[in-house]
Amino acid sequence: MSDSHLTAFDKASKAGFIIALGIVYGDIGTSPLYTMQSLVENQGGVNQVSESFILGSISLIIWTLTLITTIKYVLIALKADNHHEGGIFSLFTLVRKMSPWLIIPAMIGGATLLSDGALTPAVTVTSAIEGLKAVPGLSHIYQNQTNVIITTLVILIVLFGIQRFGTGFIGKIFGPVMFIWFSFLGVSGFFNTLGHLEIFKAINPYYALHLLFSPENHRGIFILGSIFLATTGAEALYSDLGHVGRGNIYVSWPFVKVCIVLSYCGQAAWILANKHSGIELNPFFASVPSQLRVYLVSLATLAAIIASQALISGSFTLVSEAMRLKIFPLFRVTYPGANLGQLYIPVINWILFAVTSCTVLYFRTSAHMEAAYGLAITITMLMTTILLNYYLIKEGVKPFLAHLVMTFFALVEFIFFWASAVKFMHGGYVVVILALAIVFVMFIWHAGTRIVFKYVKSLNLNDYKEQIKQLRDDVCFDLYQTNVVYLSNRMQDYMIDRSILYSILDKRPKRARVYWFVNVQVTDEPYTAKYKVDMMGTDYMVRVNLYLGFRMPQTVPRYLRTIVQDLMESGRLPKQEQEYTITPGRDVGDFRFVLIEERVSNARQLSNFERFIMQTKASIKHVTASPMRWFGLQYSEVTLEVVPLILSDVLKLPIKELVPVEDSEA
């Protein structure tokens, strides 16, 4: 990696500062909409809170943001970039060679992050729309929660509906809108605190610790389940590292944190001033003058939409990375924007929409959604901590020190997990079930791939080079295609899947002028695009290793076109002049891609568990994208061949001949 790239990545700019506000901080920036409301409602309402309770709550929020978001994510996790990319799968690719079991925390963390992403739009948009209950002239309409639900669903329909067109055209306003949002949080919060400056005593962690063990705290340690809502967006901050660069996050986070903390302090000051008023509105909206509330609701709705958009885009990226790491089924991916970073996965988009909409309809109010919110993300953070521990050791930190630091964060996060676990019976089971379903799919896909590698036999290409040459020159067979391309899952030291040679020589001899054996390897770097060619001492057999980053599309024909041109220009591959063509000077022949799918037959070698894995994976494949579409072959000539997973299983089965009995012997 060049020094200039590192400098650009670590450099901050005014434009980068604004962009970071629109991309990185949507989730954590909308937390003030519902965090204080959750704390107050769980304590029994505004009338039931005391000054010490409020001071302790604000102190817990401040120190949670400091320990988890600032220290763990901003100061430690942002250092763990994989060629400028962040997130749990990028972190996993950095450390996966250290231990094979690290795939487990990576899958669990990715699954819980996805399930959390399905709930975030429901919580944020509903919370924003519920602010209309505090707007004079509209409150009588939105006191009816059904109207809140209808408005929320309309916004969600529009939000998920525009994903297919790309969001670049509206993405340009995200940064400025969020700058206005955070500025409003800071300014309004500051003015609300002017009458109660004692609220700033909450900076002292004594008040946080005192509240945890105070009899005034009706929920005990379980209050941390509500406190954690303030920092749920910390994981997204790390995941979006590649979009804005480390330098811009370093510069923008202090501004964001100050504005968020001032907002919480301002709400706390309003509660202290109005705890005997009998007002039971969301402190976030109630703390603003009534004539400004309609503008605040509009701004909050925009901020909620931006936060939701960031989670949706993040989910697409997360699934895309998981597919390329071969731990998730293949789904069709499109790129509606001008760059590879703007991707769209239709199936995931509509699954997210269905889950989000059902969440709104099932829980109805943001208060009920908050009861379920945050449980999954505590698990994601714990999994990230495990991977960070290995990363620190890999980077040369002494194991004892790495274990000490990460054990501290793991302990803090486990306490938050334990405090949030009470949410399971209050709706948290929804995200847990969703996360378990995603983990199950990931496990099946990963385990199925390992089983295939275990049982599919390999043969040495060199041993069959002469046979392939004879077939190439044998005019008794019609020319199958000028170029025949086989995609191989593994190709090392001239070893290749037996099923490929079976297809060329046994199933139906395929005569061609050139045989291509292509293997796509996903690299730990995100944007690699390299290849290696071995002609095997011939001009008719070509081994191609494609090295593509885990964020690169695997459109094989486009890369192969470039490789063919390079080989012909260098003289390693003879030109294939075409007698009949509408393209003058065309010197590349026709191509046919042969895809081989291994299916489970009555394979006696498979255990019952392995057979269950393979049959389940086959069932999942029915609703996923075909390899043809995944490798960009939909506009190419393709042959799909099905072979048994274990070829030897069909070659010879024991069977006994029944000898007919002569009538005379009867």
UniProtKB/Swiss-Prot annotation:
It is found in: Cell membrane. Keywords: Cell membrane, Ion transport, Membrane, Potassium, Potassium transport, Symport, Transmembrane, Transmembrane helix, Transport. The chain crosses the membrane at residues 16-36, 58-78, 100-120, 141-161, 165-185, 221-241, 253-273, 294-314, 343-363, 373-393, 399-419, 424-444. InterPro entries: K+_transporter, K_trans_C, K_trans_N, Kup. It is a multi-pass membrane protein. Coiled coil: none annotated. It comes from the Bacteria. GO terms for cellular component: plasma membrane. Pfam families: K_trans, K_trans_C. The keyword Transmembrane applies. One of its GO terms (molecular function) is potassium ion transmembrane transporter activity. It catalyses: K(+)(in) + H(+)(in) = K(+)(out) + H(+)(out). HAMAP family: Kup. Belongs to the HAK/KUP transporter (TC 2.A.72) family. Transport of potassium into the cell. Likely operates as a K(+):H(+) symporter. This is Probable potassium transport system protein Kup. It comes from Streptococcus pyogenes serotype M6 (strain ATCC BAA-946 / MGAS10394).
